[in-house]
Amino acid sequence: TVCHKCATPCPVDIDFGDVSMAIRDVLRRLGNQSPNPAKSAAMFFLNTNDPGTIKLTRKLMIDWGYKAQRLGHRTLGKLGSAQTRRPPATTGGRPPVREQVIHFINKKMPGGLPKKTARALLDVEDRNYVPIIRDPAGTTSDSEAVFYFPGCGSERLFSQVGLATQAMLWHAGVQTVLPPGYLCCGYPQRGAGQFDQAEKIITDNRVLFHRVANTLNYLDIKTVVVSCGTCHDQLLGYEFDQIFPGSRILDIHEFLLEKGIRLEHATGARYMYHEPCHSPMKTHDSLTVVNALLAAGTNGRIEKNDRCCGESGTFAVARPDIATQVRFRKQREMEQGAGKLRGDGFSGEVKVLTSCPSCLQGLSRYDDDAGTGADYIVVEMARHLLGPAWLESYVQRANAGGIERVLV
């Protein structure tokens, strides 16, 4: 795996995440990598940056594909109950196709996702223009500007995450500069062992970002905002301090904490926090940030819910049999965590919050088992600070004169 969890306790200081990626790259170049249609489809979705292709692929994979998986879960879910109660061993290679299919549908995919990507909703898909998003009534051309890199998960898949980040930056009174067009950071390609593709993406992105920085040097950008941990990890190698001199990379939640933006009222829900393997919060302790943002004194202290969610990018579709084993342990943690929050007779909503798009998908699979609801921290904040119709309101206001498009 590429979670890098082995690196910390390893007595000889070997990062087996890096080793795994290197082995995959060698096997691919030698032509010995096992074919996996589901993984190939996912990588195709991440590699393309053509708006039309993304729209079609999203329709087929996310809209129809997720619906088909949920239908399979409803129809054949009982066949998977034995797997989730006691996962079978995975030694000896892959299980038969029939078992793999049951592993794939034993926990349902999330539903109710936005019908379009964040860029499509804001009409900023043209890669020849850099969008600058600002509140015309609350900002000027001299207001603080940040560069927001949404990444694939927050932009193409869970577009509500990217939009919530933009809405909260709008609320904070800053100008938000988006990259021109759909971009991937390159981490998924490295994780899949496609080192040559990853290097091409990284090089192209860095050249593009230098052009953006030269074009918008009057904005004096000092902060690069991210909403995804793997994007954060990958962007650390982009040398942004040479692109935007003196800049730093900061997670959206840490940025909001620094701006003093947090909930001040009771939400009626209780929370636990799932920390991703690739945590985007690297400046402050993640649990401290979550408790500060969500008013722990009013809504109750938020505890960490341990164990991997079992999604891990393409892991759950590439090896659903192993993902079933990982989920078995996580489900116990989820049920115990939710039970603790309900221990005093609390009958309201229990939510598990995270800061990773892939984990958001993985955690939503436990909704029925643990009686929880999975969501993103910044989405929960937008809902309670900006109102239940925050997404529609933000899109409407941004499209009504809040977007400047600069040719790059």
Language-model features, listed with the residues they occupy:
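Cysteine-centered iron-sulfur cluster-binding motifs in ferredoxin-type domains/subunits
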Residues: 1-14, 306-308
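Iron-sulfur cluster-binding electron-transfer modules in prokaryotic oxidoreductases
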Residues: 17-408
